[in-house]
Regions:
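Solvent-exposed strand-loop boundary residues in beta-sheet-rich modules
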Residues: 52-54, 95, 174
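A short, Trp-centered hydrophobic/proline-enriched beta-strand micro-motif
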Residues: 36-54
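Bacterial N-terminal signal peptides that target proteins for export
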Residues: 1-9
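Short N-terminal segments immediately surrounding and downstream of signal-peptide cleavage
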Residues: 23-42
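Extracytoplasmic
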Residues: 41-43, 57-59, 65-67, 77, ...
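N-terminal signal peptide c-region/cleavage motif recognized by signal peptidases
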Residues: 18-20
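Gly/Pro-enriched, hydrophobic low-complexity segments
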Residues: 120-122, 127-209
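An acidic-aromatic
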Residues: 61-113, 178
Length: 209
């Protein structure tokens, strides 16, 4: 099960069509709007569907609390959990009682979870045919091993920065592609810090020996 989560956090979005773009705002303006959204968003909850390169579909609920906290609560039969505590991302596989952990800054998700990150240095607006859609590709050219993330936003009055995150695609250095689609997004909802706690399966495994 590890491989399904690894591509998501160690790493051209189907949410937008690769057709000729209509007249749109400048790339700098687009990056500014996205940065404003990420800085304005205190919390977000959503349902998600995740598809990997092999076509396997997993679903669950996503919770974000800025800065840096995130939780992917997968469907029960997946036995998988991904949690970010503000500093590190942890992938817990309850099926095999394994845990992996690494800095958020080493993941494509840093673009989403670090609202102070300068997108003008790492981001590039990807043209779309819909003027209400913004797509940004974020990568660190000095750290290709961190992968690439392409996020898609749509205009939504009343949302933070008047934008709504619709999903993203992450691509790691081994070309493993993971697509996330979001629905039922809610902003500014109360989220306790305990939401980002998790149970270490290795303790239970050791106690059985």
């Amino acid at each position: 099960m590890f491989k399904y989560g690894f591509a998501l956090i160690a790493a051209p979005l189907a949410l937008t069509a690769s057709l000729p773009a209509t007249a749109q705002q400048s790339p700098a303006d687009g990056l500014s709007k996205i940065s404003n959204h990420l800085r304005s968003m205190s919390t977000m909850t959503a349902n998600f569907s995740q598809t990997d390169r092999g076509g396997q579909l997993l679903t669950g609920t996503l919770t974000i609390k800025q800065p840096g906290k995130i939780r992917f609560q997968y469907q029960k039969d997946a036995n998988l959990l991904i949690v970010g505590d503000g500093k590190a991302l942890t992938l817990i596989d309850y099926e095999v009682n394994q845990v992996q952990r690494w800095p958020i800054s080493n993941s494509p998700l840093a673009a989403l979870l670090n609202p102070e990150r300068d997108l003008s240095k790492y981001g590039k607006i990807i043209p779309t045919r819909n003027p209400d859609v913004l797509s940004v590709e974020v990568r660190d050219p000095k750290r290709p091993e961190y992968g690439v993330i392409t996020m898609v936003f749509t205009k939504r009055p009343g949302a933070p920065g008047a934008l709504k995150l619709d999903g993203w695609v992450s691509l790691d250095s081994k070309n493993n592609r993971t697509s996330i689609r979001l629905s039922n997004q809610k902003f500014g909802v109360p989220v306790a810090n305990s939401t980002f706690n998790w149970t270490d399966p290795r303790r239970k495994s050791r106690s059985k020996r």
